Amino acid sequence: MKFEYTFEGMTLKVLDETFAGKVLEFYSRNREEFDRYEAAKPNNFYTTEYIAATLKAEYAALLKGEFGRFFLFSDDLPGEILGSVSFFGVTSINRSCRIGYKIDKNYRQLGLGSLMVKHMLEILTHEKEMHRIEAYIHPQNISSINLVKSLGFISEGTAYSYVKLNGSWQDHLRFVYIS
């Protein structure tokens, strides 16, 4: 697996700890939107030190094939993080994993999420030979539900009490992409 992929004027790139400031800007700018659908973060999450340590750990995990987070950049906006897509929960015997993604609030409804996830699916199915890729989505996240459906994900029902959000356990819809 490579650390950088280019397509249609875009780049998906793994970042190391030297990009902690840029990644922190991306997360901080989108904190309110991202926190609606993500589990609680540690108190020190929004610090350069925490982000740097996370990027270093994620880089090492990619080398082992356990996890990967790629950040989305556009040729038109060099240096600006537009989104991220990650894979995790890799089960090699079943050739399966889960996928997560997010787009900067300033670049939504432009097709970037679909483009980013589409290319990550190609990478996962061709390079990592994943057969089954799951996405768990909060029922109120209609944009995300529409995104996965447009890319051929199939609904498998509800994962009850799947993630603790804002102090309470929340159901999520489970979708699967079969290569």
Where are these regions (language model features)?
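A short helix-loop-beta-strand connector motif used in the catalytic cores of GNAT acetyltransferases and
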Residues: 43, 56-71
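Acyl-donor (CoA/ACP) binding surface of acyl/acetyltransferases
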Residues: 1-22, 26-33, 73-179
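Generic alpha-helical scaffold signal
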Residues: 17, 28, 45-49, 66
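Conserved GNAT-fold acetyl-CoA-binding loop/helix
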Residues: 35-56
